[in-house]
Amino acid sequence: MAKPRRNNKNKKGQSRSQAREKEEAELLKLQERIDQYDPAVDEKSISQFSDLPITQETLRGLNESSFMSLTDIQKKTIPIALKGEDLMGTARTGSGKTLAFLIPVVESLIRNKITEHDGLAALIVSPTRELAVQTFEVLTKIGKYNTFSAGLVTGGKDVQYEKERVSRMNILVGTPGRISQHLNEAVGMETSNLQVLVLDEADRCLDMGFKKQIDNIVGHLPPTRQTLLFSATVSDSVKDLARLSLTNPKRIGVSSDQDVSATPESLDQYYIRIPLDEKLDVLWSFIKSHLKSKILVFFSSSKQVQYAYETFRTLQPGISLLKLYGRHKQTSRLETTVKFTQAQYACLFATDIVARGLDFPAIDWVVQVDCPEDAVTYVHRVGRAARFGRQGKSLLMLLPSEEEGMLKRLENNKIEPKFMNIKQKSKKSIRPQLQSLCFKDPMIKNLGQRAFISYYKSVYIQKDKDVFKVEELPSEKYAASLGLPGAPKIKIKGGSSSKEKKNASRQLVALSKTNEDGESVENEASKVRTKYDRMFERKNQNVLSEHYLKLNGSQTKEDEDEEEEDDFMSVKRKDHELTEVELPDLTIPVSKRQAKKALSKKLSISTKGNPTKLKFDDEGVAHAIYELEDEEDFIKRGDAKEQKKAFVSRETEVMNEADEEDKIMAKEKRQEKKRKRKEVEKRMRDEELQSGDDEETVYTLGGDVDLERDMEYSTDEEEQPQNKKPKWFENDKHNRKNPVNHIVEIDEPETLEDLESLTARLLQH
């Protein structure tokens, strides 16, 4: 019977080796197709995902997710990314950039035979939590037949839970802040085997203030990686990031530096000219006239979103209302995203957090209540509609002061929205209802005041002052349109921006509020001072001031001693007579030229010549500080342009060497920090194990009973089992109620003491 079993094992081993050889042969064929690909010749012949040199597992996931045909950006980027080259892709919003980098990521891991033991192999950075969630969902759909482990890390989740599992991930999708935190703090998270880095919506990441986090992420990664950078627009900051992160990148989708991605062709764009105090009336009328539509409304601040949502929900326009902004909890943000995605007719009030990358299906209208900060933001906002060739419409509300400047900036980017007239009959005013709500509900009134202040601040901080003119805004009319009795007072504080405060490390903020001993110290300015505090702090109500007492010399000796110790400057004598000091005779210049020369600093310096200060070089040789070279000596050294190029090249080499040294030093510091953290954790684990060994306790997890092993750890003095709780029929109270059933057994008493003890026992029972 043993021989057939061996034959079966041999057959299984042969089948496994054959399957492995077949898989390697398929990968070699795919690699040959990738190497032979020529964009100029083969791009026209590719129209379906099945035409690409990708594995059957990835193709099966694409087909089941209904991804069949390729878009323009996918045709151009996927074959080049499969070759392993760095890529900088730019295309219109809604053109399929997500699949353009997810397919190369999955295929790169398959060709490199990455397993769960190889650690992190691909890193995808998204600017917002919603976009990261959407990217992760698409990744799980197309990669469901592969054996990679993928994880999603975003803000608003348990950091410790993520740290325990992030080291076992092959593909990691997340926001810049959380990924940077894990790279700095997570133990066991190695990036030496990383193959691909993807920066999705790179310009948005930089606009949101994540430059430091992205630089930190890039610094942790190996230089031999492949980097894919995708964005809907290209700015100077994105070009700088590409220059630092990419190596000889292929630029796809951008024909020139001045080219900016236009809006989709299937999008109908309109704008209206409207006063500030009529915006909410027009928005209400628009929603009432489009109840059978899916509408996305953009505001400039989260406070405006809250106010519009609460008031419109109370007035009940007849359509489902939703809100989405940055300071929501992560769970509620995901619920809102899912509800709006699945709804057929709904209206979502949102900030620019929704303007990038999110794919909401079948949006009919995009309404911009507040003017976007630039043409790039306009492109991303209206790009939520008319995605993947669908029809869509957009409406932009412009103030009379914003119309001319904003239209010029849109025309410069080849965007020409059509003007739309508003019929006065179709416009309905909701100002009386808003005033009634603010009068009845203090919460809505507070929201209105905060919305007013946040809108003015958003206009004030805009850089383009030709478009945004805060001095021309009618504050009283706008406050009345919100239902407020008057315009609130606005205090605009200077200092660091809100983005920097939001992205600042909470540990550093907490550390800044501690003293030298590490104890937290409350800020004196933030304390609330009551009228009693001010009453006890009053001074000089019935006595003369300290300064007057000092001048009159009516201080005591103790006060004078304290003054000498504590005061830095004090009055030492009073009403003293000044002694006349003989002043030197100043000769007045006779001529006007000498007088002018004496009064003019420039003329007086010209006669003194150059300064005679000496400067010593590294070898200790003294040189004059203004030691200049003659023109003849300069010409002998060669052409000025050639000297300039040589100087720039020398300094560039010096800076590159210094940069490499700084990177090596920073990397050593990070490794040393991580090593110390690992030592501390190892020491803590050893202490726990030692404490467990001292107690000499053995835990058996499964398996058969081992009596010899158990007897080795047994002791003579076993712990007595804990007394069980007496049952109801064993209770003393029950025994007292039934004294007949209780029998007391005793020996025959012989002495007087025995009789006394017997009497006591009988009395107890």
From Swiss-Prot:
Basic and acidic residues bias locations: 641-653, 678-688
Coarse class of the protein's main subcellular location: nucleus
Compositionally biased region (Basic residues): 1-14
SMART domains from the UniProt entry: DEXDc (SM00487), DUF4217 (SM01178), HELICc (SM00490)
Keywords from the UniProt entry: ATP-binding, Helicase, Hydrolase, Nucleotide-binding, Nucleus, Ribosome biogenesis, RNA-binding, rRNA processing
UniProt-listed Pfam families: CTE_SPB4, DEAD, Helicase_C
Domain Helicase ATP-binding: 78-252
Ranges annotated as biased composition (Acidic residues): 558-568
The Helicase C-terminal domain, residue ranges: 266-438
InterPro entries documented for this protein: DEAD/DEAH_box_helicase_dom, Helicase_ATP-bd, Helicase_C-like, P-loop_NTPase, RNA-helicase_DEAD-box_CS, RNA_helicase_DEAD_Q_motif, SPB4-like_CTE
Motif placement: DEAD box: 200-203
Function, as annotated: ATP-dependent RNA helicase required for ribosome biogenesis. Involved in the release of U14 snoRNA in pre-ribosomal complexes. Required for pre-rRNA cleavage at site A2.
Subunit structure: Interacts with the U3 and U14 snoRNAs. Associates with pre-ribosomal complexes.
Protein name from the UniProt record: ATP-dependent RNA helicase DBP4
